[in-house]
């Protein structure tokens, strides 16, 4: 007989506060999430460049840790990667993600002078679908979503909680993505266009990596939607 218990788990994040002269009472918030096998530090390096000292930046680390096998040697020396969940009881992983996003938005608003009307989520790979689940469930909480090399939720048509959101979306696809074909990405574009407040969908000549050449456009896109 399967049962369960609930225990508190620490979820870690990196924080960077704005460096630009303060011309407003509150700052926009960029909440960034890494891909599968990534971590908060790797995503913060990208998010910092996007924010350019003009946003409160939080890089949240996935709650699930595992060893990344890197050849021979002692397992204790293997690098550690993090993820957001698997297909095993995925609803639990989704609830944790939603709860953490809400908690960080609240924290940034209360403690770090973030503007609750200027919240942007940015994700790479696996975390993209989690963010899409969030914004199409909580349709009025997020100003914009930046999704890089990711897909839409697998329950896009079946989940009764999803509906059109006031959220603007910038989706960056890789033309040479090993996981998502061009046809699959075009399908994502059609799906997102039906539910986003606006959609900017772009292909970059890249494999399944965060194309650094996209950072200037991401920055301008965020500025345009503030």
Predicted regions and their residues:
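The feature captures the conserved acid-bearing segment of alpha/beta-hydrolase catalytic domains
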Residues: 150-226
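Serine-hydrolase catalytic machinery in alpha/beta-hydrolase-like enzymes
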Residues: 4-114, 118
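Hydrophobic/aromatic beta-strand patches that form the interior of the parallel beta-sheet core
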Residues: 31, 58-60, 120, 146, ...
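Primarily recognizes the serine-hydrolase "nucleophile elbow" in alpha/beta-hydrolase
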Residues: 117-164
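A generic structural signal for alpha->beta connector loops
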Residues: 54-57, 118, 141-142, 166, ...
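Conserved alpha/beta-hydrolase "nucleophile elbow" surrounding the catalytic nucleophile
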Residues: 34-36, 122-124, 174
